[in-house]
Amino acid sequence: MAQAQSGICAEANLHGLHLFFNVFDGQDESLRAKLKQVSAIEEEFSDQFSESMLSCMVAIGAQYWPHILPEYIPSELQSFPNINHSDHQMSVQPCDLFVQIRSDREDVNHLFALQILKLFAPDVELVEQIRNFRFLDGRDFNGFIYGGDTAHGRKKRATALISNPGNFEDQG
């Protein structure tokens, strides 16, 4: 049965770190092997710092997906759109990989990020890193207040999963 990454369905944390990467040419196979190690590193950190409630998520950009897993491209996969609204503007900065790290301890996020950077080197370029936090009125890591239509529990997990004929870790 398919399982969501821990960061997909985790509850809000106090601290977070977003890492945006671009992959250097010719590093696809090397990076593919390294991506399989992220969950083991997360498990190790979760055991060592259990009180931190660490979670992690790795997202592969729509433009990079065919390089890393060409045999299975989800039908729903698309690039993040530009969002222009009178109150908000979110412009797109395409990247190959996005790593979201969240926990209740900023030091654990920092240490975990160092492990990710060490793991991915020299295959990637860190384009940007953004520290984030839980705001006073309980906003989520993106700065939005959860509305009544936000999925919770099993519905949240069902919404998060894509139909996949196999596990990513089983793919080459």
PLM regions and their residue ranges:
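Long, histidine/aromatic-enriched segments associated with O2/redox biology
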Residues: 1-172
